[in-house]
Regions:
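Active-site mouth of glycoside hydrolases
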Residues: 52-270
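Aromatic-rich peripheral "rim/lid" segments of glycoside hydrolase catalytic domains that contact
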Residues: 346-414
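Bacterial Sec-dependent N-terminal signal peptides
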Residues: 18-48
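Sec-dependent bacterial lipoprotein signal peptides
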Residues: 1-19
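Short, solvent-exposed loop/turn segments at secondary-structure junctions
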Residues: 72-74, 121, 159, 208-210, ...
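N-terminal low-complexity, Pro/Thr/Ser-rich intrinsically disordered segments
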Residues: 39-62, 414
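Extracellular ligand-binding interfaces
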Residues: 413-491, 499-521, 530-533, 540
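Extracellular glycoside hydrolase catalytic/binding regions
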Residues: 95, 185-188, 192-200, 209-367, ...
Length: 540
């Protein structure tokens, strides 16, 4: 899925060395200090770790409960082709620019680890070299996580998956041979950049890698099951994982013992009983050979339906049993690197029950968990605050226990304005995404911090059916638009403020309210639709 929808340095050199603000180690002489000539030293051994790292099993305990900084550093299509412009890509899927404050908030709420999905292919030159601007931004976000006192996982994300044009990592023998050199060069660059970071930084080999047919659930599902095709896909997954481990270890330093994460085919977890091949991704996953013992972690993802809670607990419990049977038995722990639900409209009560149960059950079994987004997303990250506070509380209490008291700020704690930066011609800000029954509502009113130039902004109201629209030019800083049922039908499905230019433009929305038939006002929360970025500005 889009999912529509990765430092601190500790090193001893002579007595000890100081780390620069970017987290890299400076040794004597590197900053231009005079160094006295010395006799040629004896040949040095292979570079070793600066510090001893905890084992993979210990890391699961140390990480605590985790969250995904999703739709942030992994977008692969944004309407932009400049892979150096990190801000455009980071905000391209509706998220605010990541800040240290966001990471501090997650730590204070009780989270101990952040998975930072990163896509790389759109940020590399023709020779596979990552643009320095992009690598610097990834480095900066990693530092935010570690500076907050949490663990961090970075990976190769939407370079895998179902997009046939952009997913250049494919689980097949031919796919591996085509991508091997580029894949290994990419991991060499990442590993060298972070070589001296401490044990709180983990690397993840790849995200949800699929076969040539882009099969989910198990290999060779989409084109009619072929045992030879499936075997080739599973072998490729293991080959990619081995390449990853070998390349990272070869860079030396702390990478010699860094805990590394390898994913099953498609990050599939084997759940369900509707096909006899569902367990194949687990049965065919192999622990990569490694120079050091106990520093490999397996990863799967999980998105069960949760409408029937007892059935969910049975299915997910069996799924967790299978991780122990097929993966943990090989000598490595498991993390569920993404989890959530595929239920279309789960009740908050069901979701919170599931979240609390799952976080606690996985902790009991020694399995790590990273919830996929849906806690602080979009403009909420710019304060920062939680947009799903009940869910966040359920997760951390499921892990830490009911006696734990998390700090969970919410939007109601603040008086806010909404600063909108338009970047694209025709881009749109949601004034409201709600479906509006015109028998109950008569219009919408909003206030801006300025009167825009004539023709620059247009109120666009999406009607009941495709092609039914109502438009009105914005001509003042305070506007009221009455609904016209003859143009819209019985309801409005979305109301936006559309930008009619391609020049960068910023304006602040101070308030938005729907007008009910009885003249009472119902406040709305603006949000980015596409082509714009929204920042929340605290006014009091």
């Amino acid at each position: 899925m889009m999912k529509r929808i990765f430092i601190c340095l500790l090193a001893f050199v002579v007595s000890f060395a100081f780390a620069s603000c970017d987290g890299r180690l400076y040794k004597p002489g590197e900053k231009g200090e005079p160094v006295k000539p010395e006799p040629a030293p004896d040949p040095k051994p292979e570079p070793g770790p600066v510090t001893e790292f905890e084992t993979s099993f210990e890391a699961i305990t140390s990480m605590g409960v985790g969250w995904n900084l999703g739709n942030t550093l992994e977008p692969v299509w944004t309407g932009d082709t400049d892979g150096r412009d990190w801000r455009r890509w980071e905000t391209g899927w509706g998220q605010s620019v990541t800040t240290q404050s966001l990471m501090n908030m997650m730590k204070n709420a009780g989270f101990g680890a952040i998975r930072v999905p990163v896509s790389w292919g759109v940020h590399m030159d023709a020779d596979g070299k990552v643009y320095e601007e992009w690598m610097n931004r990834v480095n900066e976000v990693v530092d935010y996580v570690l500076n907050a006192g949490m663990y961090c996982i970075i990976n190769i994300h939407h370079d895998t998956g179902a997009d046939e044009e952009l997913a250049w990592l494919v689980a097949s023998p031919g796919g591996y041979e085509r991508a091997k050199a580029r894949y290994e060069y990419l991991w060499k660059q990442i590993a060298e950049r972070f070589r001296d970071y401490d044990q709180r930084l983990l690397f993840e080999s790849f995200n949800e890698m699929l076969d040539d047919g882009r099969s989910w659930c198990f290999a060779s599902m989409s084109l009619g099951y072929d045992a030879d095709v499936a075997a080739g896909a599973y072998k490729a997954i293991n080959d990619y994982a081995q390449s990853f481990v070998d390349v990272v270890r070869a860079t030396g330093g702390n990478n010699s013992v860094r805990n590394l994460v390898v994913n099953t085919y498609g990050a599939c977890n084997g759940a369900g009983d509707w096909n006899p091949h569902l367990l194949d991704p687990l049965k065919n996953m192999r622990m990569p050979s490694d120079k050091v013992k106990d520093h490999i972690i397996f990863q799967v993802h999980s998105y069960p339906t949760i409408d029937d809670l007892p059935a969910m607990e049975r299915e997910v419990g069996k799924m967790l049993d299978d991780q122990e049977t097929y993966l943990v038995s090989q000598g490595g722990p498991v993390i569920v690197g993404e989890w959530g639900t595929f239920s279309e409209n789960p009740t908050l009560e069901n979701y919170c029950h599931y979240a609390k149960w799952f976080a606690g059950e996985c902790k009991r079994r020694g399995i790590g968990t990273f919830h996929w987004m849906n806690l602080s997303d979009g403009m909420y990250r710019s304060i920062p605050c939680f947009n799903s506070p009940e869910l966040a509380e359920a997760i951390v209490k499921g892990y830490h226990g009911d006696g734990f008291t998390p700090v969970i700020p919410v939007i109601e704690d603040y008086n806010l304005d909404y600063q909108v930066t338009y970047r694209d011609l025709w881009s749109e800000l949601n004034l409201t995404e709600s479906s509006i029954d015109l028998s109950q509502y008569k219009g919408i009113t909003f206030e801006l911090d300025q009167t825009p130039s004539a023709g620059l902004l247009d109120v666009k109201i999406y009607g009941e059916s495709e092609g039914q629209e109502q438009h009105q030019k914005v001509s003042d800083s305070t506007m009221t638009v009455m609904f016209d049922a003859s143009q819209l039908g019985a309801k409005a499905n979305r109301i936006t403020l559309q930008y009619m230019s391609s020049t960068l433009f910023t304006i602040t929305v101070k308030s938005v309210c729907l007008i009910r038939k009885d003249e009472t006002l119902e406040p709305c929360t603006p949000s980015a639709f596409w082509g714009c970025e929204v920042q929340l500005i605290v006014t009091g």
